[in-house]
């Protein structure tokens, strides 16, 4: 396949073969919102940036006065359209990402956004669930990445080299396909 002279590579990582592996939490699972919010507040006090992937966890934080550094949302919770957001941000980005996949370009986009000192909101046309992977790989050591575990609670990843190694291991098992 020729990709030279083409600004956009239309390739994705596909995770159909990894559904079972990806269904378990890859961090600390919080099932109690009070304890979860206390942990996040202490993390902010220690200087950690908070990054959320998912509408529900983003909304829980916002409703409790915590505005994440970066939110990655698709406007849906459990595939159901959610209400409009109450908080607006200075920087808003739009990306496209199909369900069960991660577009190659998302990795560079997330890296650039996370280098920015302002953060913001990434609106995903499609599905954001798997974008925890590029976010975790691009986040700073000590950043907190939060995503929802359906019917269980919120999963908190404290970014370090060990978790990056685990994420790269998952990524190596994914299948590269045309989007």
Swiss-Prot record:
Keywords for this protein: Coenzyme A biosynthesis, GTP-binding, Kinase, Nucleotide-binding, Transferase
Domain of life per record: Archaea
Top class in the EC scheme: transferase
Single GO molecular function: kinase activity
Catalytic activity as recorded in UniProt: 3'-dephospho-CoA + GTP = GDP + CoA + H(+)
EC number: 2.7.1.237
Pfam families: DUF359
GO terms under biological process: coenzyme A biosynthetic process
Keyword Kinase: yes
Annotated GTP binding sites: 55, 57, 74, 76, 128
InterPro entries registered for this protein in UniProt: GTP-dep_dephospho-CoA_kin
Pathway terms, separated by semicolons: Cofactor biosynthesis; coenzyme A biosynthesis
Function of the molecule: Catalyzes the GTP-dependent phosphorylation of the 3'-hydroxyl group of dephosphocoenzyme A to form coenzyme A (CoA).
Similarity annotation: Belongs to the GTP-dependent DPCK family.
Protein's name according to its UniProt entry: GTP-dependent dephospho-CoA kinase
Organism: Saccharolobus solfataricus (strain ATCC 35092 / DSM 1617 / JCM 11322 / P2) (Sulfolobus solfataricus)
Biological classification of the source: Archaea, Thermoproteota, Thermoprotei, Sulfolobales, Sulfolobaceae
């Amino acid at each position: 396949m020729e990709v030279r002279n083409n600004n956009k590579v239309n390739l994705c990582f596909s995770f159909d073969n990894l559904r079972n592996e990806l269904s378990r939490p890859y961090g600390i699972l919080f099932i109690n919102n009070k304890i979860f919010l206390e942990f996040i507040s202490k993390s902010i006090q220690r200087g950690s940036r908070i990054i959320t992937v998912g509408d529900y966890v983003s909304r829980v934080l916002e409703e409790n006065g915590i505005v994440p550094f970066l939110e990655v949302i698709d406007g849906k919770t459990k595939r159901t359209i959610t209400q409009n957001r109450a908080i607006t941000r200075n920087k808003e980005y739009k990306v496209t990402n199909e369900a069960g996949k991660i577009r190659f370009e998302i990795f560079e986009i997330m890296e650039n956004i996370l280098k920015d000192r302002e953060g913001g909101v990434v609106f995903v046309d499609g599905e954001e669930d798997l974008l925890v992977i590029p976010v975790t790989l691009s986040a700073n050591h000590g950043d907190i990445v939060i995503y929802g575990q359906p019917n269980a609670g919120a999963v908190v990843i404290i970014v370090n080299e060990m978790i990056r190694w685990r994420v790269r291991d998952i990524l190596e098992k994914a299948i590269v396909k045309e989007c």
